[in-house]
Amino acid sequence: MAAEADGPLKRLLVPILLPEKCYDQLFVQWDLLHVPCLKILLSKGLGLGIVAGSLLVKLPQVFKILGAKSAEGLSLQSVMLELVALTGTMVYSITNNFPFSSWGEALFLMLQTITICFLVMHYRGQTVKGVAFLACYGLVLLVLLSPLTPLTVVTLLQASNVPAVVVGRLLQAATNYHNGHTGQLSAITVFLLFGGSLARIFTSIQETGDPLMAGTFVVSSLCNGLIAAQLLFYWNAKPPHKQKKAQ
């Protein structure tokens, strides 16, 4: 039994998905209904799934912009505010030594979001401005992650996530409403973000116990749900120039 307990399954699960005491509880004592350990397993599994999914979640949006050679319908201010929120979550989590499974998607979403920022500027004829923005962002990120930045500043940055998310999503919602369509917004990206933010409410409570993190994801879920609802509402709506081509 001891050899089985220390076998490949244990090496796979401990410590990535379970602490050793929970592994023993579930797979040595076979207490498969041990709720605290099941919650840890579910939270870790969801967290790692979200992180893995985040590698691809915004690529449909990137490819849609590249394919159309246009960022029509995307609010640059909204994308930038989302970048601020992702940066705040990432810096706050690194500073507080939270487990990577509780915030890792912020890193990958940040890289994809800053790519979208640049593409929006590029297709608006502001390529030089876009390059300068990338350089400035990299410099600011280095400063935020350095010992020069006090913890109070990092906490304030995380606290600013809620207004940043709300304002950013409302700007995108207003753009959609004004245009009467969702332009180059990717439905796959929007629905994946909505599902991910919902799951993150549970994982942030379970893995960090931080009310600031959990509150951010509650607000993010509500705002992402608004954009998802607009996508469904405007599903068959097209920009005016595409309507003319269809006619």
UniProtKB/Swiss-Prot annotation:
Q: Where in or outside the cell?
A: Membrane
Q: Where are the transmembrane segments?
A: 37-57, 74-94, 100-120, 128-145, 151-171, 185-205, 213-233
Positions of modified residues (N-acetylalanine): A2
PQ-loop domain residues: 39-105, 159-216
UniProt keyword terms in alphabetical order:
Acetylation, Congenital disorder of glycosylation, Disease variant, Membrane, Repeat, Transmembrane, Transmembrane helix, Transport
Q: Does the keyword Glycoprotein apply?
A: no
InterPro entries in UniProt: MannP-dilichol_defect-1 (IPR016817), PQ-loop_rpt (IPR006603)
**What protein family does this chain belong to?**
Belongs to the MPDU1 (TC 2.A.43.3) family.
Q: What does this protein do?
A: Required for normal utilization of mannose-dolichol phosphate (Dol-P-Man) in the synthesis of N-linked and O-linked oligosaccharides and GPI anchors.
Q: What is this protein called?
A: Mannose-P-dolichol utilization defect 1 protein
Please give the organism.
Homo sapiens
